[in-house]
Amino acid sequence: MKTMWRKRKIMFAIGIAILIFIIWNLSWLVFVNFKYKPYTETVPKDKYGTYHIVGSEGYNFNVKKPDYLSLTGNLGSVAPDDICSLIIWPKVFGGYKYGLRIQDNSGGYDIMVDSNGNPIRLDSQSNEEFEKTVEIIQKNKVSIQKIFDKVKSQWDLS
């Protein structure tokens, strides 16, 4: 009798675990499809199964949906001259984080920016590093503004 009761407890626990797993997977699937649908509508899948399109004036746009059971994907755009790239991470509860990659003769720079392209000071940055970041942003302001304008016309990021 005790072993029968014990087996039932174990089967009940396994059933609950499977149910939780199914609910989590379905919740993730619904979230990803709902959250990324507006972005994938304007950037269709290409023949390789990735969301990628070359837009007007040669700007590339791509959508990377979150990997399995992850909630973080991104939107990307690359300028035709490859000097400026913009990565946008949609936040789970609304809003976005923005990052720029700027290439020049002295190398590449990854810079976190706000929705207007202004640099965000990171806690780990020294004054000198932040001043260099501001200088790079100012030097490439036209390219940055243009890529932001292209992205805003491609996706509604309000």
Report the location of each language-model feature.
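N-terminal Sec-pathway targeting helices
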Residues: M1-I23
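Intrinsic low-complexity, intrinsically disordered segments enriched in polar/basic residues
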Residues: K2, K7, Y96-Y98, N118-I120, ...
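N-terminal export/targeting and maturation segments
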Residues: F21-Y96
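A generic signature of intrinsically disordered, low-complexity regions enriched in glycine/proline
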Residues: L29, T50, L71, S85-L86, ...
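Structured, soluble extracytoplasmic/luminal domains of envelope-associated proteins
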Residues: A79-V134
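C-terminal partner/receptor-binding element of secreted or periplasmic proteins
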Residues: I120-S158
